[in-house]
Amino acid sequence: MTFIITTPPAVEPVTLDDARAQVRVASVQEDELLTRLIGAARQHVERTIRRALITQGWRLYLDDWPPGRVVRLPVTPVQAVTSVTVFDAEGMPVALDAADYDLDGISAPARLKVKAGAGASSRSLNGIEIELTAGYGDAGEDVPAPLRQAILLLVAHWFEHREAGIDAATASIPFGFDALVAGYRVPRL
């Protein structure tokens, strides 16, 4: 199973003003660094908990349907499955009808159940593509407050420890981070 992001989030869960307040910097001199740190912190939180925070597009590639034709989706919360495509004997894409599959977006990880007889692929590798939209919503306010706070905690920590040195290895994740994200972790597939 391979999955890639096709449409990155349009905004970050926290604003530059939020980050400035967290690191107690009033000037705009550090804005470029803070912007990079916000993006890196969001990505770190997303990888840690296996969730998309802000609405984003994903594509999942499968060689074949798993047993029971139930696909455990690698990112959650899933807002919608936008398409399921298989490839015929000539290598041409064939889109499945939405009635051929059901999304369980409540489970974590989310699951996609494909009905028996729907869409077998003739390709031996990456013959199935699933396009989906995931995330809590389009705005930072849609993201749960503990996850936004975890991002700000990382931003402040990395801002303070931005110089590589002896202490950098022991100071990679700040105290309190794990407690903020613990309730949002999705078990590994």
State each model region's role:
Residues 1-189:
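Divalent metal-cofactor coordination and adjacent catalytic microenvironments
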